[in-house]
Amino acid sequence: MKKDMMKAFKLIRYGVMAKGTFLIMVIFFTAGTVLELMGFSVQMEGAQSGSGRYIGSVFILCSAMFPGQLLISTSLAGLVQTSSYKKRIQTSMLAKLNMFCNFTAVTWIVFLRLVYGLVYHEDMAEQMDSLLLTGLFVLLFNLFSIIVYKYFVASILIIVFFSMAIQVFDNWLSGGYAPAVFHLHPLLAVGFSYGMLIVGGILSYWISKAVYKKELSRAAFGAAAARQI
């Protein structure tokens, strides 16, 4: 695994529009962190509800998908197309890179949520509910980051549908309708987030192997890269 990860990090430097993609990744991560901190200040006033509880986390999780995008774009190169690296890039290396990036993102979100919950004990339950949503989103994004390069339109429709479903679940959770079993203990909430990360990583690897022979979707890449497909 370590060998694959080192090669993946070397390869992403040669991805399509690498500098611009890294810049966008940093912007998403920074915006997500700022939104998380702003959300905390709103929660202190007792005004935050709905998607405001997790929008910062969504931005942070989105930033974790960009390295995988760069990695898979390297498989468009002619030399890679004719080498044994192509399958590894689109399957095991992509799944491992996504797992690492998602782990980093989830750990940062958990850190922010736990720090806030420890400082403001009365809001700990609110933060743990948000971690439950984070776990659902990390599972969804993990699978999306594999399927999108093969079935672009279908994957967009799927992520929109399930994002709306998570929003409905959050409204049910925050509206006081959910049974107590859904309001997890802090350790269980953290464990759930990491558990969904692991489940998503395993499923994404299996899916990547299942759809490997499917041609990459032109719509999933910019115009310059699409011409190489």
Q: Residue locations for each model-derived region?
A:
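Short helix-to-coil transition segments within interhelical loops
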Residues: 81-87
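Hydrophobic alpha-helical transmembrane segments of membrane proteins
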Residues: 1-77, 92-229
